[in-house]
């Protein structure tokens, strides 16, 4: 029972870290888009 719990916790941590990386890259992409739009507005 205990080994199953530990395995499950490790599985959860791996999933969380994966989703965290995904969200982080997504946010960086959005900020890049916003920055490029701001630069485009400044040009005009």
Curated annotation (Swiss-Prot):
Main location: plastid
Any one of the GO CC terms: chloroplast
Location(s) in or outside the cell: Plastid, Chloroplast
Keywords for this protein: Chloroplast, Plastid
Gene source species: Trieres chinensis
Name of the molecule in the record: Uncharacterized 5.4 kDa protein in trnK-psbC intergenic region
């Amino acid at each position: 029972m205990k080994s199953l719990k530990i395995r499950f916790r490790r599985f959860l941590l791996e999933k969380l870290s994966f989703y965290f990386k995904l969200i982080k890259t997504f946010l960086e992409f959005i900020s890049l888009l916003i920055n490029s739009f701001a630069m485009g507005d400044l040009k005009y």
